[in-house]
Amino acid sequence: MNAYTLAKERYAALGVDTEGVLNTLKDVTVSVHCWQGDDVVGFDAKEALSGGIQTTGNYPGKAATPEQLMADFDEVLRLTPGKKKLNLHASYAIFEDGEFADRDAIRSKHFSRWVAYAKARGLGIDFNPTFFSHSMVKDGLTLSSPDETVRHFWVEHGKRCMAIAEYFAEETGKPCVINFWIPDGYKDYPADRLSPRRRYAQSMDEILSVPYDKTKVFPCIESKVFGIGLEAYTVGSAEFCTNYVNTRHITPLMDNGHYHPTELVSDKISSMLLFNDRLALHITRPMRWDSDHVVLFDDETREMMKEIVRADALGRVFLATDYFDASINRISAWVTGLHSVQKALLYALLEPKSLKKLQDENNFTELMVRQEELKIMPFGAVWEEYLRRENIPQDYFAEIKRYEADVLSKR
């Protein structure tokens, strides 16, 4: 009797059908961020990374061209199980030789190579307007700027991106989540907190006035508590973004690195699901701030996935990864983070439904005991069976070292 068969029997004794769990897991889509591969540089500008974002490290092998980034992404797809989408920033527009369009002039054709890439691999595409690392970010402001020239530039960028998002959805046949995050804020205490937020709301209203198919395109806005150089005030606070999405009937997006370190997104998920049809998540690992460390199979990642599964909301939550580490092999960073999300999903799906009954009966003594027992159940055997069925190498690191020797080390 192999390890999986034994694990299957152990979980069956708890009322958990591991076959059903594996069938569910393989159909859960995770949107994979492209920017781990090149440290959030993109292809449309040469400005340094800005907007309170920072990558650290200088590990060799960074992708420097669209071809290299696509090749690296292929390696990630090969080494990770489950369904995936490609998540792009607008800064990853691909221009032909001699061609360039600024961010207020980008068009669908500048992403046609990404569409061809995604369609050849059966991937959908999610999208993010890029409101950072650009000379038109004036005094740290974009959509909330009091300078109408600046604000109009970024409103036009947002409108162009909405059209591109619909192009992605139509071409791939899969919905496109388009996420708006702006770095706007102030380093020190402002004299006026209201006006920038009013301008941000006005700008978003203008962007969303562009007609779009609400069954294909899902706009989100993402909050943040602070960033480097934006310590005192962030225009897109959690309260602003929550109220905006609720009054405009769009999708909230929570990044678990964008809150105060004592706040847990896992505790927020159930509340958001009660009052929204959909919810989007950016899954990362904050280390005292929004450091975007590689996602691990840690407590909070597991708790977030458990909250989604317990709410029977896998069909309502858009899952996406968002981290970037330049200090280690970037393929390994990508793959390890994705494996961690998949492991957390599996761990959540293997939780017995009977735990809810214990809570409702105020049987907290047994609830504690059963929850602790689950931690040493043969979860690993089920995970290994999942990898086997998905034709993923058990020792993915050996494959990463081979790719580093054959490809990355020669860049």
Predicted regions and their residues:
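Alpha/beta catalytic barrel-like cores
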Residues: M1-P146, A163-I164, E170, K174, ...
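Conserved, mostly hydrophobic/aromatic
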Residues: D17, W154, D255
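Active-site acidic/histidine proton-transfer and metal-coordination neighborhood
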Residues: K109-F132, M136-T247, T251-P252
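Long, well-ordered mid-to-C-terminal structural blocks that present hydrophobic/aromatic surfaces
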Residues: V235-F275, A280-I283, R288-D290, L296
